[in-house]
Amino acid sequence: MLTLDQMVGQEKIKAYFQRARAVSHLSHAYILSGEEGMGKKTLAQAIALLLVCEEGGDSPCLCCHACRQVLAHSHPDVIELVKEKSISVDDIRSKINDTVDIRPFSAPVKIYIIDHAERMNVQAQNALLKTIEEPPSYVIIFLLTTNREVFLDTIQSRCIHLRMQPLPVEVVAQKLKESYPITDMQAREYATYARGNLGRAKNLLEDEAKRIRYQKNVKILKDIGNFTLEQMVKVLAEMKEEDSNFSEFLQFIRDWYRDVLIVLVGADVRKLIFSTEMKTMKEKAEQYSLTKVNQILEAVDLAQDRIQANVKAELAMQMLLMEMKVGEDNG
């Protein structure tokens, strides 16, 4: 668990909480939103650590009984609600509503952290709304989410919304270099691919299945011109088990052809995502016309639209891969 000072980035949000705490003007409910891997839970826990520390300094001491309890996830006044699937009304009632009127055991505040709060169904949101509307003065609720739009308007209007921002690619690359045995170029590629999301970049390096899928995707796009229909069917069937609506692969294809486009038009190659594939990108740029690359990018959007319209995903993807193959055949 990190302190606010140890967290990388999110300077505006960290400064906000430091100021709000200094003048005793913390809100009773916050929505922390951002992509998976942006550090929403880490941030909420760091704030909890700061607020319950017995020393009351600008940074938690990490030594007092309260700090040690938070670090061990056992502080009675820092309650986390984590559910793998949906969050039901019973979950909200038992974890929050039934305990909210019990004063803090030892801390000056009572903090509730709801992870993946977008998993609350409407009934659960309505149950939580009652607490958010009239909370005890000592209560602070954090709703952590990848999509705040799923919340009822009445909940959104009663919470302060703070959005987690991506880190500069250079910062993520440096952090990866410090933690993993990779080259500068690899670090930059993963950081760029993750779009400044440190958690996502780390997950790609630590999760063997994701790393293998990344490498397989690169190979598919490098070799697509030589694929037969049978090979396309095979790779799509394998991929569907990991990514049922192919959303990650579709974004991967966009990123790949974006890089081809950068080389094709002579733009700054430092902006490439797949920087370790520079040689391949130059070869692809020689094979494609600008019109053809744009047609493929439009075909990617069309494939996604078809899948969202309930066209069989494998069929939509086969049509896309055929378009990409024809592009290599004809330029």
Regions found by a protein language model. Give the residues of each.
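Catalytic acidic motif of RecA-like/P-loop NTPases
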Residues: 115-121, 126-133, 149
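Conserved catalytic/switch belt of AAA+ P-loop NTPases
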Residues: 101, 126-143
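Clamp-loader machinery-focused feature within the broader ASCE/P-loop NTPase space
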Residues: 1-123
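Structural signal for conserved beta-strand scaffold positions within catalytic alpha/beta enzyme cores
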Residues: 80-82, 143, 161-163
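Charged, glycine-rich active-site and insertion segments that engage polyanionic ligands
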Residues: 1-49, 66-69, 137-138, 147-252, ...
